[in-house]
Design a protein with these regions (language model features):
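Short, solvent-exposed, charged loop/turn and helix-capping segments
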Residues: 21-25, 51, 82-91
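N-terminal first-folded block
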Residues: 2-45, 49
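DHp/HisKA dimerization-phosphoacceptor four-helix bundle of two-component histidine kinases
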Residues: 9, 40, 63, 67-70, ...
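Conserved small/polar residues in nucleotide/adenosyl-binding loops
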Residues: 92-98
Length: 100
């Protein structure tokens, strides 16, 4: 696998943004249940991408990337729910990238 891996890099950046968002929500709104779900699914994406990269077979790679995709869908759900229940403001739920 190439050293320059866009999916690996973006999933790490996304996980960092999710951790920062979790800290913000839990410190500002004292909300822990929904934001914990967001933290778990949002950081799991990158973990599964890393596992896919180190996979033992093409089938293992595909399976792990599919899990990462499912975690991304779940993360999208938690973000929408937090936004719809006013734990996230419109300006907050569109966060800035962690790297240029």
């Amino acid at each position: 696998m190439k050293a320059d891996n866009t999916i690996k890099d973006k999933s790490l950046d996304f996980a960092i943004r999710i951790v920062r968002l979790y800290k913000h929500i839990s410190e500002t709104n004292n909300e822990y249940i929904l934001s914990k779900q967001l933290l778990k699914s949002g950081t799991s994406i990158g973990a599964n991408v890393r596992e896919a990269i180190g996979g033992q077979s093409k089938e293992n790679f595909i399976a792990k990337m599919h899990i990462a995709l499912k975690e991304a869908y779940e993360t999208e759900y938690w973000l929408e729910l937090l936004y719809s229940t006013d734990y996230l403001l419109s300006l907050i739920h569109i966060s800035e990238p962690t790297r240029p």
